[in-house]
């Protein structure tokens, strides 16, 4: 009886309503006032720490280039950059033509994490937890973007910078780059969700080694433990970006609505229990089944096998 009612409800649900519901789910945050998190108060505190910028360029290819731009401080996140990252994530949530995203640092290095000026000023446990919740909210929304994302690690990704790479679907390094979770050396643990995501990427045992040893992961070591997906041949900033775009193209060929639906489906499987993940997969299927790309593919009569 319950199954019949659910099916009846599903049949009455319009595709537009399903799309609206899925878009709302993408933008959901982990924390709100019920968790003691007051976003506007945190924003006011972060505004006090200027410097750098988060720059977004949208390519006609459907690839977005997100650049952490604070080179005088190894692209460390100022308070303003944390706020701008959230703004860019919200913009990307609404970029319906987008299929892929590359996040990188300016001037051939990725990021050294948090700007120490902000860290020193926000020194109480309450401040630390507030910024933690803000960045976990932002990076979870980043992770849920319906775009296939790649962290292009040129130079060093340290501390919070290393955590940001874990919010991406894939990670690419050059022969000269390094990833290091230095949190232990700072007397803390990862606070932007990096430990949780790292366990998912490389498993609990390897994650414990990486975190407790504050290990320096060069490209070969990172590749061996499954932290990164490939090593790019060039270390030149411009050439390396081109190589990353070419690498990403193999996964985003096809109509945006199909690529985005695939990413949404995988994101659901990672976060939900089996029953909920299957239901979400059903909902996402309803946004592409019978659509232009599906009908065109069916009309080709299996030519994709050749």
UniProtKB/Swiss-Prot annotation:
The reaction(s) this protein catalyses: (2S)-ethylmalonyl-CoA + H(+) = butanoyl-CoA + CO2; (S)-methylmalonyl-CoA + H(+) = propanoyl-CoA + CO2; (2R)-ethylmalonyl-CoA + H(+) = butanoyl-CoA + CO2
UniProt keyword Cytoplasm, yes or no: yes
Listed EC numbers: 4.1.1.94
UniProt-listed SUPFAM superfamilies: ClpP/crotonase (SSF52096)
Main location: cytoplasm
Pfam families on file: ECH_1 (PF00378)
Full protein name: Ethylmalonyl-CoA decarboxylase
Gene assigned in the entry: ECHDC1
């Amino acid at each position: 009886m319950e199954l019949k009612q659910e099916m009846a409800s599903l049949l009455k649900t319009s595709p537009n309503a399903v799309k609206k519901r899925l878009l709302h789910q993408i933008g959901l945050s982990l924390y709100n006032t019920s968790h003691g998190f007051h976003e506007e108060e945190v924003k006011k505190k972060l505004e006090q720490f200027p410097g750098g910028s988060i720059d977004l360029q949208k390519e006609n290819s459907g690839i977005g280039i997100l650049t952490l731009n604070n080179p005088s401080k190894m692209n460390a996140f100022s308070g303003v950059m944390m706020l701008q990252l959230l703004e860019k994530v919200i913009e990307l949530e609404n970029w319906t033509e987008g299929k892929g995203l590359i996040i990188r640092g300016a001037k051939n290095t990725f990021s050294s994490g948090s700007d120490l000026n902000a860290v020193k000023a926000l020194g109480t446990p309450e401040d630390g937890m507030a910024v933690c919740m803000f960045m976990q909210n932002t990076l979870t929304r980043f992770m849920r973007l319906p775009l296939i994302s790649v962290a292009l690690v040129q130079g060093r990704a340290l501390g919070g910078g290393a955590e940001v790479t874990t919010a991406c679907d894939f990670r690419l390094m050059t022969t000269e780059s390094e990833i290091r979770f230095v949190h232990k050396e700072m007397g803390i643990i990862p606070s932007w969700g990096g430990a949780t995501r790292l366990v998912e990427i490389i498993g609990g045992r390897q994650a414990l080694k990486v975190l407790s040893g504050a290990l320096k992961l060069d490209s070969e070591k990172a590749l061996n433990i499954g932290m990164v997906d490939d090593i790019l041949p060039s270390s030149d900033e411009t050439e390396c970006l081109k190589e990353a775009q070419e690498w990403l193209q193999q996964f985003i060929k096809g109509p945006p609505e199909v690529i985005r639906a695939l990413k949404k489906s995988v994101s659901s499987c990672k976060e939900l229990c089996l029953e909920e993940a299957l239901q979400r997969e059903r909902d996402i299927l309803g946004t592409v089944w019978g659509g232009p790309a599906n009908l065109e593919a069916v009309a080709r009569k299996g030519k994709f096998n050749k």
